[in-house]
A protein has these predicted regions:
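A nucleotide-sugar donor-handling region in carbohydrate enzymes
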Residues: 121, 126-182
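Intrinsically disordered, low-complexity regions enriched in small/polar residues
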Residues: 6-7, 45, 156, 173
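N-terminal amphipathic/basic-hydrophobic helices that include classical n-h-c signal peptides
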Residues: 1-9
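Active-site and donor-binding regions of nucleotide-sugar-utilizing enzymes
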Residues: 17, 21-37, 42-146
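Extreme N-terminal starter segment of soluble prokaryotic enzymes
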Residues: 10-15
Length: 182
């Protein structure tokens, strides 16, 4: 199902904002793959880079604070803390993880591009995103959508095809999780 805010008449270009964490990139790619099943779209991954890398820890706190009253001025402040991102030709922004949230919200507001964010809000309101996918309900805003299975780049059909070559043996599966979305 195509979200209502997307114009699908032409090929859609999706920008993935990445914090460099492989699991977060895989979740964003999973969203893009789901959209590719519904419409003609391509995606590009852009890894975020702080202008003042040595100040990133206090700046993360600062930009989350700015998101509590996000407007064009504060969004430009947030965007200005990162190395430039060319977003003009993109129709949608997708990002996963807490390190991308503030910039995703800011870029979406400044450039009026719909955005999808995956992950727990960490104090940033769901209303700043066109779609905010979380593992549990954090916000009463309609953009906060709860899902049972985290999107990822490995589709069920790909896994089914791979299982054909699988030879059953005795295996043990160990799953380790944290307090994030994955």
């Amino acid at each position: 199902m195509i979200p209502y805010f997307l114009n699908i008449e032409n090929a859609m270009r999706i920008l993935i904002l990445s914090d460099g964490i492989p699991g977060h990139v895989n979740q964003s790619i999973g969203i893009c793959h789901m959209l590719q099943g519904e419409t003609n779209c391509t995606f590009e991954v852009h890894e975020l880079a702080w202008k003042l890398h040595f100040l990133r820890s206090p700046l993360k706190i600062f930009i989350r604070f700015l998101c509590s009253f996000l407007n064009t001025f504060t969004a430009n402040l947030i965007q200005g803390l990162f190395k430039p991102i060319m977003v003009q030709d993109f129709d949608l922004i997708v990002a996963a993880g807490g390190n991308t949230m503030a910039l995703n919200a800011a870029v979406g507001l400044i450039h009026k591009i719909p955005n999808i964010q995956l992950g727990s809000p960490r104090g940033i309101p769901s209303r700043l995103f066109s779609v905010h996918l979380t593992s549990e309900k954090f916000d009463d805003h309609p953009s906060n959508i709860v899902f049972d299975i985290t999107p990822n780049k490995y589709s069920p059909s790909n896994c089914s095809r791979a299982s054909i070559n699988f030879h059953p043996q005795d295996f043990i599966l160990l799953l380790i999780g944290g307090d994030g979305i994955g």
